[in-house]
A protein has these predicted regions:
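Bacterial N-terminal signal peptides that target proteins for export
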Residues: 1-8
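Surface-exposed charge patches in extracellular/virion surface proteins
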Residues: 4, 20-21
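Acidic, glycine-enriched active-site microenvironments
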Residues: 13
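Subset of outer-membrane beta-barrel
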Residues: 22-390
């Protein structure tokens, strides 16, 4: 048995970044992009998930490292920390989860800069390795993790930019089958982001309109066999806008929209070459040899419109203490067929904020259906205030 192929298959299933394929979707209508370390694109926090997986232009919070690090420069609190937990694919297994720790600290004159960091850990649960006869060889616990460091700065009163550097490690467990193969792979990546916000007055109400972008996971490829079969990182372009307006005293409503495009070229398929195996093998080799940067440019020529995913969501806030959220995520059948609603709520009291979200998939038998997320956040300014410190 090829142990690592089996584990890789588990990893692809576990991250569930493509939908549960329906029988009525023809091969010509279903061609999702495949990458390595796909857990990097799983939404870590409950707030973003409850609005349909968006956050490029929403108000900054401790989890902005994933959505748009440049937002930290506009954060109202000087510092914040957040811990999120997501049980993953609980309809199928009960030991796969994503844990995420993120935080930031404002620096510089007038707090116009921020440093940030995050640690995400994706556990693939417990996997039993067997030989060809079905005998147990070992029990392993594969995982994927990433550590980020970020920096953001206001370039004007309305615009900021940010960068993040990331170290990625994917460990598929102990190698029990082939001493010439490695069980782990690592890579480095970077994000580049920007955020613009302004406060237009409509009637007698001061509103807030924001725009944001984040180009994430631009970096080296990952490989478990010495570079013979490298995989692209899940590079992604996220564009978003958000508009907040007051409904009444202490009542605000935010409407947000995000659009995403994977910056990875689709893997060639044999059916696209009318059975010409030689042409297919040549195209596959070109795809494997292509650099990550070249792949980014080529990704825009591959059914561009069909590969854009959309998220639309809303957040109602009462006195910045009670929050109700909802949203919808859409991906075409061609790109993966993930379509689902998100909903959630949050409660903030002094220094602590608690958020929860729930996913309802519209596709039948989707493993993403009923996904729960929980986030616990701490306002460090509030903690200092309670302690009576400046």
């Amino acid at each position: 048995m090829k142990l690592y192929r089996s584990i890789l298959a588990v990893a692809l299933m576990a991250t569930a970044l493509t939908a549960w394929c329906q029988d009525d979707i023809k091969n010509t209508e279903f061609n999702p992009v495949t990458t390595g370390v796909t857990s990097l694109n799983i939404t870590p926090d409950a707030r973003g998930a409850s609005m349909g997986d968006l956050g490029a232009a929403t108000e900054a919070d401790a989890n902005s490292q994933f959505w748009n690090p440049s937002k930290y420069a506009f954060a109202y609190s000087r510092a914040g920390v957040s811990l999120s937990y997501t049980p993953w694919l609980r309809k199928i297994v009960n030991d796969i989860y994503l844990a995420n720790l993120a935080g930031y600290y404002k620096i510089g004159s007038n707090d116009n800069q921020a440093v940030s960091a995050s640690l995400r850990y994706f556990s693939l649960g417990e996997v039993t390795a067997t030989d060809g006869d079905g005998a147990t060889l070992s029990v392993i616990n594969p995982f994927e993790m990433a550590v980020d460091l970020g920096y953001s700065r206001k370039l004007s009163e309305k615009f900021s930019m940010g960068v993040a550097l990331r170290y990625i490690l994917s460990d598929l467990g102990a190698n029990t089958m082939n001493v010439n193969e490695s069980s782990s792979a690592s890579a480095f990546a970077a994000d580049l982001s920007g955020y613009y916000t302004t406060f237009p007055v409509i009637g007698r109400n001061e509103c807030q309109w924001s725009l944001g972008f984040n180009v994430s996971n631009i970096g080296s490829k990952v490989s478990y066999n010495g570079g013979n079969d490298p995989a692209y990182l899940p590079a992604n372009l996220r564009l978003g806008t958000a508009f907040t307006f007051p409904l009444a005293d202490y009542n605000n409503l935010t409407i947000s929209l995000d659009a995403n495009k994977m910056l990875v070229p689709a893997k060639p398929r044999l059916e696209d070459f009318d059975g010409d195996n030689m042409a297919y093998e040549d195209a596959l080799q070109v795809w494997k040899d292509k650099s990550s940067i070249s792949g980014i440019f080529d990704s825009f020529s591959d059914n561009f419109a069909k590969r854009i995913t959309y998220s639309i969501g809303a957040e109602y806030a009462y006195n910045q203490q009670f929050f109700v959220r909802g949203g919808y995520y859409y991906e075409s059948k061609y790109a993966g067929n993930r379509q689902y609603f998100g909903m959630g709520a949050g409660f903030s009291l002094n220094v602590i904020k608690i958020d929860a979200s729930y996913m309802i998939a519209t596709a039948q038998n989707s493993p993403l259906d009923q996904t729960l997320r929980f986030t616990l956040s701490f306002d460090m300014d509030g903690i200092k205030g309670l302690l009576g410190r400046d």
